[in-house]
Swiss-Prot record:
It is found in: Cell membrane. Belongs to the energy-coupling factor EcfT family. Pfam families: CbiQ. One of its GO terms (cellular component) is plasma membrane. The chain crosses the membrane at residues 32-52, 71-91, 107-127, 152-172, 246-266. HAMAP family: EcfT. The keyword Hydrolase does not apply. The keyword Kinase does not apply. This is Energy-coupling factor transporter transmembrane protein EcfT. It is a multi-pass membrane protein. Transmembrane (T) component of an energy-coupling factor (ECF) ABC-transporter complex. Unlike classic ABC transporters this ECF transporter provides the energy necessary to transport a number of different substrates. It comes from the Bacteria.
Length: 266
């Protein structure tokens, strides 16, 4: 649980940290779309270069991103193996037995899927590590302003997102404390097969859910005591302003996007 870093903010002074949260949110969303548009090694080389440049600009250690990948590593490996073993025939066949078919195209596609997972996870991790949860909520509310014309509760949704992001690392820390307490009582969460390991997590889930409900109730009581009204319009302590660095970042991304489109049909 200590390796789970999604939702954590790492306060540093870097170009990425100073970017407008709206720019980072839109860029992250478009980045994921572009990742699925890439279909050759040159396209992925551009995406990798952009991602590495963003990580270096953020001044965040690579170890944090590896921690972000570790909890999802089993899902990545499982998906890659499925693609590798059960891909349709195409290119040179390296191994064939019954319905298992390892081909050249399957190997290439498995590699692409592996890189896609890594790029998306690393960019999502960079977004949360370099942006405070409140800034993410504020940026999202600003981007969703047009939805107010169709009576969508934008401020409420932004508040819910902010609270959810803020509580993710808190609940992970709580889960770590509960697991350590149960290990001290002799519980081994890594013993046995997959089913037995999943069953051993049941004593963890009950106190974790109780803790989550108690924290949610305490938070709602504190908000009501401070006069929070969901329907009231409120000003922002920090006004978002689009800076030159946001424009430059987007121009670099658009330049890479155009290059990927060119390589896609090359």
């Amino acid at each position: 649980m200590s390796n789970f870093i999604f939702g954590r903010y790492l306060p540093l002074d870097s170009v990425v940290h100073r970017l407008d949260p709206r720019a980072k949110l839109m860029l992250s969303f478009c980045y994921i779309i572009v990742v699925f548009l890439a279909n050759n090694i040159w396209s992925y080389a551009i995406l990798i270069a952009f991602t590495v440049g963003a990580i270096l600009s953020s001044k965040i250690s690579l170890g944090f991103f590896l921690k972000g990948i570790r909890p999802l590593l089993w899902l990545i490996v499982f998906t890659v193996v499925l693609q590798l073993l059960f891909s349709p025939a195409g290119g040179h066949t390296y191994f064939h037995w019954a319905f298992i078919n390892v081909t050249q195209d399957g190997l290439i596609n498995a590699g692409y899927i592996f890189v896609r997972f890594l790029l998306i996870i690393m960019m999502s991790t960079l977004l949360t590590l370099s942006t405070q949860p409140l800034d993410i909520a504020t940026g999202l509310a600003s981007l969703m302003k047009p939805l107010r014309w169709v009576k969508v509760p934008v401020d409420t949704l932004a508040m819910m997102l902010s609270i959810a992001l803020r509580f993710v690392p808190t609940l992970m820390d709580e889960a770590t404390k509960i697991m350590n307490a149960q290990r001290a009582r002799g519980v081994d969460f890594g013993e046995g097969g997959l089913f037995k390991q999943a069953k051993s997590l049941i004593p963890l889930m009950v106190p974790l859910f109780m803790s989550a409900f108690n924290r949610a109730e305490d938070l709602s009581t504190a908000m009501e005591a401070r006069g929070y009204q969901d329907s009231e319009h409120r000003s922002q302590y920090r006004i978002l302003t689009w800076q030159r660095r946001d424009t430059v970042t987007w121009l670099l991304f658009l330049l890479g996007f155009v290059a990927i489109l060119i390589f896609r049909h090359w």
